[in-house]
């Protein structure tokens, strides 16, 4: 079942704030169904390009959908325009649904200012571009504004720091609504240099060790990621990729700073954690992930945490 995603388009919105997240979600295939809505049938964006065939603001949003608020060029948000006033009135009508997390709000860059003016960020941990953090605090004094964050998700509200951070946040949404594997596939297709997570390292190791562009390492990582429960050894992996085991080991150390075994172990930990979070017992989850026992998994976790 696909997730409905509504991009709210207003005049002078940053094209990258729209197309960056939209293309990221679109590359996840049928998992997301994208809609473009606006108080106007067509608007001019930051580059001067006109966007037409925009649908009117809906009276109802589907349960579990995403409402995306892109940022405005140069963060010059004018709340007194006719479009802004209509939009704010519409957004305020969703406050109760947002509180019970009937759907999710996604703010790209200065889109957080629009959400703040509508009263949607009270009591919410949030962030925005570093140049307008003080303005966000002024508009939403009851919000918990955080600095030095790429993105934050709190109580169904997602906010992010700036233009390219919208892609990081969109990859996080693919990770959350689809799977780590799907997020990894999309990141690779976009050739995204991707060490960035939001406020934690929940995407690790699926994406944390994908910040390189070496095809040999990617092939080895893909093989391990597909079947992390298998007892892969470096000689077997090297043979499948048609390189020597010494060369493969050297590449992992050089580009990732870890060994093939360490990467494999962290993949198993990630799989086990997913099963545990879904309700599976620790012992069974450890076995399904490829560990010989829960005790071995705990030891691996201690090694990974240093």
Segments the model singles out, each with a brief description of its role:
Residues 1-105, 114-117, 175, 184, ...:
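Extended, subdomain-level signal for the structured scaffold at the beginning of enzyme domains
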Residues 19-22, 137, 167-171:
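Predominant activation on well-ordered alpha-helical scaffold segments within soluble catalytic domains
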Residues 105-106, 127, 146, 158:
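Structural detector of well-ordered beta-strand residues that form the stable sheet scaffold
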Residues 113-120, 152, 166-167:
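Acidic/polar active-site rim loop that often engages polyanionic ligands
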Residues 121-149:
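A conserved active-site-flanking secondary-structure segment within enzyme catalytic domains
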Residues 149, 153-189:
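Conserved anion/nucleotide-ligand pocket segment
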